Amino acid sequence: MIKPVPKSLFKVDTPRGFFAGILEAGFTIFVLLIAIRFFNAPNYCKAILAAGSSAGLILSPFLMGLWGKSKTPNSIKCGILMASCAFLIFLASSTNQILFFSLLLLMAQICLSQVPSLMIGIYSQIYSKKERGFRFSLNLVLSTLGGMLSSYFLGRYLDLEFADHRIALWTMAFAALFCSLLHFCMPKPLGVPAVVNRLDLFRNIFFIPFKDRLFFRILIAWMILGFGVIMTFPLRIEYLANPNGLNLKNEEIALIAVSNF
């Protein structure tokens, strides 16, 4: 039976949740804010930045299928993805070309979006049913706390006259790199991971929702809600930041976004 010591995972996963919150807040708020106020980005670049996490979720089932026959532990896969995310963010901080900036951060968000589904597998292998909910919810609380604190301090910093937008990107890159190191330190399952048949995985993606009508309706509603959020999020950030809109400070935009969006 695959059952490493859950406490060792909990000790590593707790700080990971905090730094993952910093990274998520950065992608949700600051990449758009930087594109608008520091790059004066065209609309198509804002759309690329806003669609990154959704593109990652769409690709997730197919990437899971490609990795299905790999015996590499999920924690190692997460570590590689987060290291790739950190590298792409660092590259984005070194360019002045807005299209290159947007595409690099799009790829970084795709890498980040694969981690939650892999982490669910880690939790199910290591935590018991009784402790899984509490420890996962604590991770979410710490993630929210990390996002709130980073939004406040980075927002205040970007309001300074000498502010350099690369500091926000370097903070995100450091958070991703630290998460990567923590993933590599996570306990590995003692057994051999089950091999997933790729054909079965792809078949389940398309046919399982139709077998359960309630699940299918919830899935459709969730997708429609997601499309609404994705389409309007860049508009909300733009309205808060635009001189023809509310023209708020970066700190105010960050706090409003992290608390309401």
Task: List PLM regions with ranges.
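Helix-to-loop junctions at the C-terminal end of transmembrane segments
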Residues: 60-73, 158
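C-terminal membrane-cytosol helix-exit motif in multi-pass small-molecule transporters
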Residues: 174-192
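Glycine-rich segments within core transmembrane alpha-helices of 12-TM secondary carriers
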Residues: 56-60, 136-152
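Helix-loop boundary and gating motifs at the non-cytosolic
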Residues: 1-58, 214-256
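Cytoplasmic helix-loop-helix junction between adjacent transmembrane helices
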Residues: 112-141
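Hydrophobic core of transmembrane alpha-helices in multi-pass small-molecule transporters
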Residues: 18, 98-115
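Flexible cytoplasmic inter-helical loops of multi-pass small-molecule transporters
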Residues: 187-204
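Structural signature of the two symmetry-related core transmembrane helices
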Residues: 75-90
